[in-house]
A protein has these predicted regions:
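Hydrophobic alpha-helical transmembrane segments of multipass integral membrane proteins
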Residues: 1-4, 13, 31-38, 91-104, ...
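Helix-loop junctions at the membrane interface of multi-pass solute transporters
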Residues: 1-21, 25-26, 45-49, 109-118
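Alpha-helical transmembrane segments
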Residues: 25, 85-92, 98, 138, 231-239, 268-272, 295-306, ...
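TM-loop-TM module centered on a large, flexible mid-protein loop between adjacent transmembrane helices
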Residues: 25-105, 120-161
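Transmembrane helix-loop boundary segments of multi-pass membrane transporters
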Residues: 85-91, 95, 148-175, 188-192, ...
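C-terminal membrane-solvent junction of multi-pass transporters and transport-like membrane proteins
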Residues: 125-133, 170-221, 228-264
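Charged/polar low-complexity intrinsically disordered segments, enriched in acidic residues
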Residues: 245-296
Length: 308
C-alpha cells in the first residue's frame, strides 16, 4: 500500500528547493495514503467479512466486495445489485495502475541514472536524450522488462516479491539512518529523523516482522536477487565506482566477503525451509537452485578471502 512514496526522492535533482520540498512531499503523501487506505479498508470490511478476502490476489478483493452488495437467491448465491459497478471499478483500477507504473518507472530510471553516474552501472543507464532531457534508454529498457514480467509472472509471485523487496529496502534505509547519524554526526541536515535510535529500530523490527509472514520461496528469491546484485557490484561496480569508499580498503574487502558468505548460508537455510514447508517429496527445483547458488558463491568468496 505504501510502495512508491520513496520515489519522490528520486526526483530531487529536478525539484526546486529540494531541502524544503522533498520532506514535505514524502510526509504529506504518507499521511494522505494512510488516511485513504484506512477508509478503503473500513469500507471493504463493512461490505464483506474480512475472511472473504483471504487468499485473493490483485483486484479480486474489490470484485468480492461488490458481489456481496446484493441479495441471496433461493440457492443461497448472492446476486449483485450492481453488476455494472464491478466492471467500472475494475476499469478504473486499471487506469490507476497506469499512473502507478509511470511513477515507478520514473523513479527506477533515476536511481539507475545516479548509480551509473557513480560508476556502479555501465554508462548506458546515464545516457540522456538530447530532445526530451530524460534517460530514455533506461525508460525503454524498463518498459520492456516490466511488460515481460507482467505478462509471464503470476500475480501472487510478483506481489510477494514486490512486498519483500520493498520491506528489505525500508529495513536498509532504517539501518542507514543509524549508521550515518553515528558516523557523520556533523553533516548539515535540513530534516532530521526524530527520536533516533528509537524510530529506526522500530522501523527495522516492523519490516522484519512483516517479512516473516511471507512464504519461504519468496525468501529464496530475495536472497538470490541480493547475491546477483552483489555479483554486479563485485564484478563491475567496485572497479568503476568514482567514490571508491570501502572497495579498496582491507576492512571494506573483508566486509564484502563476509556479506557474500552470509548470503550464501542464508540461501541454503531458505532452500531447506521452503522444502520443509512444501514437503520433501515435492518439486525440488528451488532447493537445487538455492544450493547451486550457495555453494558457488561460498567457494568464490572463500577464494577471495584466501587470496587476500
Amino acid at each position: 500500500a505504501f510502495l512508491g512514496f520513496d520515489a519522490v526522492s528520486t526526483a530531487a535533482q529536478e525539484t526546486k528547493n529540494p531541502k524544503r520540498n522533498m520532506p514535505i512531499g514524502i510526509l504529506v503523501s504518507l499521511l494522505v495514503c494512510t488516511v485513504l487506505y484506512m477508509v478503503f479498508a473500513h469500507v471493504m470490511t463493512g461490505v464483506a467479512h474480512y475472511t472473504a478476502f483471504s487468499g485473493q490476489q490483485g483486484i479480486a478483493p474489490v470484485a468480492i466486495a461488490i458481489e456481496h452488495m446484493g441479495q441471496a437467491d433461493a440457492a443461497g448465491i448472492i446476486q449483485p445489485d450492481y453488476p455494472w459497478l464491478n466492471r467500472a471499478i475494475v476499469l478504473s483500477i486499471l487506469f490507476g495502475y497506469c499512473s502507478v507504473i509511470m511513477v515507478t518507472l520514473l523513479g527506477q530510471s533515476r536511481v539507475f541514472l545516479s548509480m551509473s553516474h557513480d560508476g556502479l552501472l555501465p554508462p548506458f543507464f546515464s545516457h540522456i536524450n538530447e530532445k526530451f532531457r530524460t534517460p530514455a534508454r533506461s525508460n525503454l529498457l524498463f518498459m520492456v522488462l516490466v511488460g515481460l514480467l507482467a505478462a509471464f509472472v503470476p500475480a501472487r509471485l510478483a506481489g510477494e516479491m514486490t512486498s519483500i523487496g520493498t520491506l528489505m529496502a525500508f529495513t536498509l534505509v532504517c539501518a542507514a539512518v543509524l549508521v550515518v547519524r553515528r558516523t557523520m554526526p556533523d553533516v548539515p541536515r535540513s530534516f532530521k529523523t526524530p527520536l533516533v535510535p528509537l524510530i529506526p529500530i522500530l522501523g527495522i523490527l516492523t519490516c522484519l516482522c512483516m517479512m516473516l509472514f511471507l512464504p519461504a520461496d519468496t525468501w529464496i528469491r530475495l536472497v538470490l536477487w541480493m547475491l546477483i546484485g552483489l555479483d554486479i557490484y563485485v564484478g563491475y561496480g567496485m572497479k568503476h565506482s568514482k567514490l571508491e569508499h570501502g572497495g579498496d580498503t582491507r576492512h571494506g574487502q573483508v566486509a564484502l566477503n563476509m556479506i557474500g558468505l552470509i548470503l550464501a548460508v542464508l540461501c541454503v537455510i531458505t532452500g531447506l525451509w521452503h522444502q520443509q514447508t512444501v514437503g520433501w517429496g515435492e518439486n525440488k527445483v528451488l532447493l537445487i537452485i538455492s544450493f547451486v547458488f550457495a555453494f558457488t558463491h561460498c567457494a568464490y568468496y572463500m577464494w577471495r578471502i584466501w587470496r587476500k
